[in-house]
From Swiss-Prot:
It is a single-pass type II membrane protein. Keywords: Cell inner membrane, Cell membrane, Cytochrome c-type biogenesis, Heme, Iron, Membrane, Metal-binding, Signal-anchor, Transmembrane, Transmembrane helix. PANTHER family: CYTOCHROME C-TYPE BIOGENESIS PROTEIN CCME HOMOLOG, MITOCHONDRIAL. This is Cytochrome c-type biogenesis protein CcmE. One of its GO terms (molecular function) is heme binding. GO terms for cellular component: plasma membrane.
Length: 150
């Protein structure tokens, strides 16, 4: 090989390596991202079964039911729509009806029930994450304690 051919081979190998690295990083990020939805958005969104998402809203009053073992079912609402949720595990201490919650998981097998593997409750009675508050406000839900939105 001439010097020119060697140089082209090295440059071509470097470009191929960088392309492969960028594709691997993009694939890893796409697998780690969980988009945020409120129940009213899910009706418009095309979320494929098995796709990980974060579902945020309020725990509907009277919807919390304890099943066998550590399985809990409850309903998340934004006052415009509701989504039934199933969670197996220990709920946060601040989890209760009427409080804000963010559940992370997926819809499994085309079922309308959201299967959560992580449930987060807001840390006091007035705090609400800004993205949850913005989504609820966009759908016309009035919020008390707006000075506590962070």
């Amino acid at each position: 090989m001439t010097r020119k051919q060697k140089r082209l081979a090295i440059i071509g190998g470097g470009v191929a390596f960088l392309t492969a690295a960028v594709l691997l990083v993009m694939f890893a990020f796409s697998q780690a991202v969980a988009y945020f939805y409120v129940p009213g958005d899910l009706a418009k969104a095309d979320v494929a079964p098995g796709t990980r998402i974060r579902l945020g809203g309020l725990v509907e009053a009277g919807s919390v039911k304890r099943g066998e073992g550590r399985t809990i079912t409850f309903t998340v609402t934004d006052t415009l729509a509701t989504v039934p949720v199933t969670y197996t595990g220990i709920l946060p201490d601040l989890f209760r009806e009427g409080q804000g919650v963010v559940a992370e998981g997926a819809f499994v097998g085309g079922s309308p029930v959201f299967v959560a593997d992580t449930v987060l409750a807001k840390h006091d009675e007035t705090y609400m994450p800004k993205d949850v508050a913005d989504r609820l406000k966009a759908q016309g839900v009035t919020l008390g304690g707006e000075e506590n939105i962070r």
